[in-house]
Amino acid sequence: MAEITAKLVKELREKSGAGVMDAKKALVETDGDMDKAVELLREKGMAKAAKKADRVAAEGLTGVYVHGNVAAVVEVNAETDFVAKNAQFVELVNATAKVIAEGKPANNDEALALVMPSGETLAEAYVNATATIGEKISFRRFALIEKADEQHFGAYQHNGGRIGVISVVEGGDDALAKQVSMHIAAMKPTVLSYTELDAQFIKDELAQLNHAIELDNESRAMVDKPALPFLKYGSKAQLSDDVITAAEADIKAELAAEGKPEKIWDKIIPGKMDRFMLDNTKVDQAYTLLAQVYIMDDSKTVEAYLDSVNAKAIAFARFEVGEGIEKKANDFESEVAATMAAALNN
């Protein structure tokens, strides 16, 4: 039997990332053969990862990396927020964003096949991380955005890395692009422009807005407040030329009824049309970047502000950890609590 020295254990730990006891056991089982011990730990790690495969990993971090004219934003999940702050986990997230920005995979399968600087694939890195960290660690998704030489990336992470954003802005500078990304992080747009919204989605959202107005009007009636008008339109996509022409005609009729002289109508109509557009694009304001009120200048929309500084938003990607993941009631933290309770009762 070979002597298992502290030096051997340390070397194996450095190669595998395993804990002290796991490394020592592997060396004992392989009679001190370093290569066999590494392989044994790898196999045990795969087994541990398989056992954790059905767990829900909804915590974690985003990673953002810019590589020349290519930028990547990724989401990596863990089971608990505690592990998401682990140095090994953070390093894995950052390495994932870097290798994806450099490798430009087309999908998750291609991403997981990318080779890390350590020589292992990304998939193997996640198996090993699950084994050494002790929780299910999973690579969830990524987005790649490319830009032209004259354009600017805005890379931004918020809330300790739970939100990651990449934006591309034409004109301006990197600082402006970062400000746009800060807006995106805060206001949660899902698309750039109203042209990307599905017609049925707009109708459904408009119905929800009018339902909210209906409920509000019931409350207002109880205190003798006037009812709010229902919305006829929710998006610029619904405002055809005929709708715009009719709105202008209604404004002119209103001004005439009020006795306003026609010579001043040209000064009044633009402001009223702006109000009409604002009132009838509520869905756009909720979901499209360009229609949102800019957080850095609330007198303008994002589109209007960028236009005022000769810039234009081209594209963006925003990830927030855990969005769309349904957590099971019996998650990892609950399992730990249940295990501790059982131990105390025995």
UniProtKB/Swiss-Prot annotation:
GO MF annotation: an example: translation elongation factor activity
Q: Where in the cell is it found?
A: Cytoplasm
Gene3D superfamilies named in the record: 1.10.286.20, DNA helicase RuvA subunit, C-terminal domain, Elongation factor Ts, dimerisation domain
What is a single cellular component term in the Gene Ontology annotation?
cytoplasm
Q: InterPro entries attached here? A: EF-Ts_dimer_sf, Transl_elong_EFTs/EF1B, Transl_elong_EFTs/EF1B_dimer, Transl_elong_Ts_CS, UBA-like_sf
Q: Where is this region: Involved in Mg(2+) ion dislocation from EF-Tu?
A: 80-83
The record's annotation in PROSITE patterns points to: EF_TS_1, EF_TS_2
Q: Which SUPFAM superfamilies match?
A: Elongation factor Ts (EF-Ts), dimerisation domain, UBA-like
Record keywords: Cytoplasm, Elongation factor, Protein biosynthesis
The primary site where this protein sits is cytoplasm
Function of this protein? Associates with the EF-Tu.GDP complex and induces the exchange of GDP to GTP. It remains bound to the aminoacyl-tRNA.EF-Tu.GTP complex up to the GTP hydrolysis stage on the ribosome.
> To which protein family does this belong?
Belongs to the EF-Ts family.
The name under which this protein is listed is: Elongation factor Ts
Look up and give the organism this protein is from: Streptococcus pyogenes serotype M1
Q: Gene encoding it?
A: tsf
